[in-house]
């Protein structure tokens, strides 16, 4: 694991990450309010394409996207999941917080195989 700065996140006890596999995403809720989601696709080789980071307008620019990605990445790390980031926010996040680079798959993308 690469070291680097640690992302600051919201520490509210009412924040909850909910897996929503039917919609291919992880949802962030605060009490009963929907904050946003991280859209994902599980690929043939078991890696996860992280495609979209969306936060409701009312919660924008308050650090919720960073909190959402951090929560999901911490869960992926615990589960041994590798990612293939295509979301531009996630690509920027990985540049700012290289301690999560170990999650990035180092095998060829199965979608690019003939």
Segment roles from a protein language model:
Residues 1-58, 75-79, 96, 109-114:
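Non-catalytic substrate-recognition and accessory regions of acyl/acetyltransferase enzymes
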Residues 91:
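Metal-centered catalytic cores of metalloenzymes
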Residues 59, 63-68:
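Conserved acetyl-CoA pyrophosphate-binding loop and the N-cap/start of the following alpha-helix
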Residues 67-82:
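Conserved acyl-CoA
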Residues 101-104:
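Short, hinge-like loop/turn segments at secondary-structure boundaries
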Residues 83-88:
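Catalytic nucleophile loop
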């Amino acid at each position: 694991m690469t070291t680097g700065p640690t992302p600051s996140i919201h520490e509210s006890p009412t924040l909850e990450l909910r897996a929503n596999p039917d919609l291919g995403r992880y949802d962030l809720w605060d009490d009963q309010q929907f904050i946003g989601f991280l859209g994902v696709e599980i690929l043939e080789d078991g890696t996860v394409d992280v495609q979209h980071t969306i936060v409701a307008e009312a919660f924008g620019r308050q650090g919720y996207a960073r909190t959402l990605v951090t929560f999901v990445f911490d869960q992926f790390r615990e589960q041994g999941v590798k990612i293939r980031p295509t979301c531009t926010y996630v690509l920027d996040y990985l540049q700012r917080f290289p301690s999560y680079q170990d999650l990035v798959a180092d095998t060829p993308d199965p979608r690019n195989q003939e």
